[in-house]
Every structure is written in C-alpha cells, then in structure tokens.
Amino acid sequence: MDDQQRASDMIKRSLFFLLVLTIAFSQTPDERGYIVYVGDDSPNFVLDFPNGTQTSLEDLNGQVTMLQFTASWCHVCREEMPHIEKEIWKVYKNIGLSVIGIDRDEPADVITKFAKEVQVTYPLALDPGADIFALFADRSSGVTRNIVLGPDGKIVFLTRLFEIQEFDEMKRVIHSLLENRLKEQKDSLAAKKQIISQLKKHQPPNERYSTRKLETDLYKAERELNRKERRLALAKLKL
C-alpha cells in the first residue's frame, strides 16, 4: 500500500469516527432529558387524535406552535394544564397559536376523560409507546415539558416541570413570536396592495373588475390582521 492510499484510508476512518461521535452526541440527553436544543429544526412527526384526525409538522408550517407533553397520571401536568388553557390557549388561539397536548402512551378513552377532568379545550394527541416524546427527549425522562416552535419549524423554547418564572418567560416568547409573525403578514399585505395599485394604473377601465375581487380579499385580510393586532395589544397588558 503506497503513502497516498494509506493517507486516503486514514481520512476515511477519521471522517467515519467523527460521524459516529456526532450522532452519539446528538442523541445524548442534557440535564433536563432533552435531546434537542433551541435553534434546532423540529423533528418531523405525525400526530393522531382520539377523534381519528391527524396533523403533522408540515400542517403546522407558518404557525407558532406549542407542544405540551403530558399524561393523566402526571400530577405536575394536571397542575400546569389549567394555566396553559387560561393564560395561553384562550388568549392566543385566535391570533395564530396552535397548542397541542401529546399524551404519553395512553388510550383514546383515557385521554378524552383526562381532558375533561383538567378542563382543557386544546386538542390532546395520542403517543403510543412515547415515540413522539422520544423524538425530543430521552424516553426514560420525565414527561412534563413544553416545546415552542416558530413558524419556520425551529425550536424556540423548551421547558421542564412547571415553574412559574419559566412559564411566564414562555408566554413572553410566544407573544413575541406572534407579534413578529403578524408584522410579517402585514408587510406582505402592504406589498400586495402596492402591486394591485400598480396593476390598476395600467388597466383599461373595462378590465378593472379583475382586480376588485383581489381588493376585497385584501380588505378582509387587513381587517382580520387588525383584529389580531388589537387582541395582541390587550394580551401584552397581562404579561
């Protein structure tokens, strides 16, 4: 074997070793049991609900999303969930936030009963075998945790247990994400209005009907964004 071949083999072995280390490190849980980190892309997932419907990460694209891992036997979860319902879900559900509870390894009838007991109205999904949980945290770690995803699917905030200070910080993060998302939507709307304005200038009067529907749709969208903006302003007073 010549020197060039030996050098090539050494590089291949080194790259393989680095790859193994990278994979092992990425699956090593932190002190809270997480195997994902803020800034990571969310693992892909498909969630099944007791009513037979499904949702996936792709379906949530463009939305701010909060995943709440829970179980009926978890006392801390039962303590936290009414706060999620009152302080997060009811405040932001019509302003662009999705909240999904993910119940660890329990059947549909137990989950439905659990939701009624803790009086939450946000949806609870099934997680048989804790397979969804294991995408985000070590399977053997504690269940009570929340994960906030930005509109781009990146992980923005992670919580563990129910600590008021951390919970309040999560609310501020969610609010900020929704404010930023609303600003992006308003900027996009303004750009569309500008395009329509330019189109009208170059359209003969008898063809302007084609832009009227676009104007009507934009007007409705603008009203909806203004409504969300007012609700966000009111919500900010409570942070």
Regions found by a protein language model. Name each.
Residues 118-121, 127-173:
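Thiol/disulfide oxidoreductase modules built on the thioredoxin-like
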Residues 64-65, 144:
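Alpha/beta-hydrolase fold active-site loops
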Residues 13-23:
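Sec-dependent N-terminal signal peptides
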Residues 27-57:
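N-terminal "domain-start" segment that seeds a small globular fold
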Residues 69-86:
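Conserved redox-active cysteine motifs that mediate thiol-disulfide chemistry
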Residues 89-130:
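Conserved segment of the thioredoxin-like fold in thiol-based oxidoreductases
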Residues 28, 38, 42, 177-239:
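Non-globular targeting/processing and membrane-anchoring segments
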Residues 66-67, 99:
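Hydrophobic beta-strand anchors of alpha/beta hydrolase catalytic cores
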